[in-house]
Amino acid sequence: MSHTEVKLKIPFGNKLLDAVCLIPNKSLTYGIILTHGASGDMNLPHLMSLASHLASHGFFCLRFTCKGLNIVHRIKAYKSVLNYLKTSGEYKLAGVFLGEFVGESGTENASSQ
């Protein structure tokens, strides 16, 4: 295997977000944060496959489950995940790319930080 899988619980208000990190077996530079669209969870086959592919090519990849349709809630969840990565001290990344799959067609929304 070209990467290691680590399960996480990320603080989000008075709850915890379920998350999985795929950590490449080489030095980290950039990370990618993925979540599902309005339905499903982080274990959707296309998210798992994408995360595995990215990690096998040297990208740190974190996917998480974010229940709820409210966009403000989802943005706060992304911010909590990003803050966790920045403050945990475990993962030193030069930058992070955020992505979300929406709809049946797997259309991707993304931004980078």
Predicted segments, located by residue:
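Serine-hydrolase catalytic machinery in alpha/beta-hydrolase-like enzymes
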Residues: 7-95
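Glycine-rich nucleophile elbow surrounding the catalytic serine of serine-hydrolase chemistry
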Residues: 96-112
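Plant-biased recognition of short, low-complexity, intrinsically disordered N-terminal tails
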Residues: 1-2
